[in-house]
């Protein structure tokens, strides 16, 4: 598995509606007339973590009437949703916790919680190293946050080793989805997690150890969540999973729904006009998925398919279980049904044993397939993974040099593709008034580019959430273009 990475950030989530799904968690709300408690959520890592952070806010809102804030100074609860993909992930978490400790010294009643993949790895060691942390929970137990919160607030003065029930990093099947409140969103795009964990066990990856084996949500559960989002005005869905195209959800009759079939079901949900998904694995990118691109216009013309290396030798060492020829053949089949497809991928540069020839294979692959963009990083060991036992025989200086060369190739490709959009007409979903250009609306094209176009005051209201076509006149940046409104499709 490979995750698309974001810079660590805090996200604000709208206050959720009441729902019966948390009825079994009979926690008290704030007393009448008392100000609502506020929770600040710092999110690191992939889209799965962004999704999980939204659910953390929803769970605490539903159980304790909390509201999410993006102002850390006013928060009553601080939650860190951690990611273990990047180098020295654990130390970065403890470094940030050190800064949070100062906030707790100023506000002793402040509750601090650590969740996500680092929490899953470290467990109760987090409270041993940082005893001011009140609760620790894994990706599969975020639905138990209300219970952990209640237990932590009653044990403020208890030493970490004597606390009871404030650490839960277990893997309780996929039950968390059964206890989450109904989704509540603002905007026209939403993430929907369709599965958890990964069973591919790539030699460099910690995900199977932090999120567990692959477990797919039942088909009806996934569709019910998407239906609810569509009723709230969502028009674009991104299906999430560490190995999303390995989805095998159970149907009512006990049969299994595979990923390609799921795409057809989602495409028939009233109101959903766009479907994206991440992160996929080449082993699971089957012909029936490619056929879905030929049949479903809702599937966008953008695919993120991590390859990690252009060298068969390195792919074997990574235990990716496919070759470059297989990968290229898949892309060629896809291009045959979607010639306008934009590709992105993940790459690890400087994996143990990578020679100059191996690196050139990776560079040549990037040039041959003309990737639109990529998430590329130098290799660093992840504790507990098979690759961590390999000799890290590529010097840091060489890794950095190769990464710079590789990323320039990708940047050049991105810029070229953006320049080629000038003169073309793109379908765009309008989302907001542009902050820097108040006379213009901002939307997203199928190929992920941000698109600006001038709009009247009336259009600034009428076109929100609508699909339009825009003829591109110039580019603003490698990932943003500007154009003129051609037609309103809704």
Curated annotation (Swiss-Prot):
Positions bound to [4Fe-4S] cluster 1: 46, 83, 117
Keyword check for Manganese: no
Domain MTTase N-terminal: 37-154
InterPro entries listed in its UniProt record: Elp3/MiaA/NifB-like_rSAM, Methylthiotransferase, Methylthiotransferase_CS, Methylthiotransferase_N, Methylthiotransferase_N_sf, MiaB_methiolase, rSAM, rSAM_horseshoe
Keywords from the UniProt entry: 4Fe-4S, Cytoplasm, Iron, Iron-sulfur, Metal-binding, S-adenosyl-L-methionine, Transferase, tRNA processing
Cofactor binding, note field: Binds 2 [4Fe-4S] clusters. One cluster is coordinated with 3 cysteines and an exchangeable S-adenosyl-L-methionine.
Coiled-coil features, chain-numbered ranges: none
Taxonomic superkingdom: Bacteria
Cofactor (UniProt): [4Fe-4S] cluster
Binding residues for [4Fe-4S] cluster 2: 198, 202, 205
TRAM domain location: 419-487
Subunit structure: Monomer.
Name of the protein this chain belongs to: tRNA-2-methylthio-N(6)-dimethylallyladenosine synthase
Gene designation: miaB
